[in-house]
């Protein structure tokens, strides 16, 4: 029997799914993250998980993005051979992009446009987050099975691939590789591992495995049924025993699950891919059967645990950014929690590159960074009465190569971002007696509530990568690298790896 899929239904389903996953976490992720929160013994990691859970519920209630990076769209289509497409002005992939465009430009909840059409030269933003990455397979049947995902750059950039010898140890490679990924992929999350096929097939297997439901708690409770499930448990436990923890701060839970997908391969080969999924974990599954657009049921409010993060005013230091001095910055200790109030500047990859070019030419910068703090962020556009949309930190290591320049030539005194800093940046921070502060990735809507005013002050043509001035009140951050160059992303995981090795713990 032939099924007719109409263009409008297809487009509306893609757009609706992208809106849905921008503000609703999958139920399985929340259940496993809540369990990790209950088990966590590290105060810093527990606080980070509390922020993620609180942010998640806020986003569900406010229908605003979980993360400011609303991702590059991945769509997996299994198209029944008895399906007929009606009213499609172009191909199926073009229809996917029509849906992406509609979903990302929704005036009630505009999503951040992050896609640049020319990846090597001009890197100009397409303004509507198209094109998507589309995988299509023809299968028997009369329906279209659809998986829609939106993958953030922080986790996608940590993807790994290796071509192993057949006798090489997969477990050893994973345990050696995960620490090199840092915390820019926003753990706690999921690892997807693809084994076999060819290089590109292994990468696709890893990505597809991340679309499966998280079931590690159930798997451990009932025990493995086969070698693959036993390997998943082994990898999950051993990765968590590394002590990396939530946001890389050190703790019991780094991964909530490990997924494995395999395909036949050449006798001389063992291609292995590993792709992490972050704390946003955006994906949805639906089937089009010709009856109309897909409907995705909103999750029950009862899904979320009774976790309501709020600043700890007894343990946190209040900082006035408008009166901040280098001496005060140098007094901060690793792990200190700060509540920032006052004016800060923003800037990320494109802004730093342009600043570098302007300084090289002796040109005047659009803003004075002297005595200022910079926040690595590309916010979502505001709606209704918002000052700014979700505005969580981006991965800071991408700005490492600019750190010496910014501290030495602009008068900048501190930086805010996500995850760890590399050796060169840490040395620059130590040399200039500066500091690096971190916010929690995956808590973008929560963070945005601390921003009371926002205006573009430079490089407006860069869109979300423009330089903004934010006026904030009690914005929560942690001292991640102090003026002596001590990094909590080094000390925290080392401490918790040792603790886990010496104490019996239940790994989430």
Which residues does each PLM region occupy?
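Short, charged beta-turn/beta-strand-edge "cap" motif at the junction between a beta-strand
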Residues: 337, 343-347
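Short, structured beta-strand/loop micro-motifs enriched in basic residues and often containing a Trp
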Residues: 314-324
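Feature captures the catalytic cores and cofactor-binding loops of soluble hydro-lyases/lyases
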Residues: 210, 214-243, 247-250, 346-475
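Residue "hotspots" at secondary-structure boundaries inside conserved domains
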Residues: 327-330, 367
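Glycine-rich beta-strand-to-loop/alpha-helix junction loops that act as flexible
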Residues: 191-198, 341-342, 417, 440-441
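Short, well-ordered loop/turn sites that connect or cap secondary structure elements
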Residues: 329-332, 338
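C-terminal binding/interaction regions
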Residues: 250-258, 265-266, 279, 449-508
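Non-transmembrane, aqueous-exposed alpha-helical and coiled segments at domain scale
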Residues: 1-312, 408
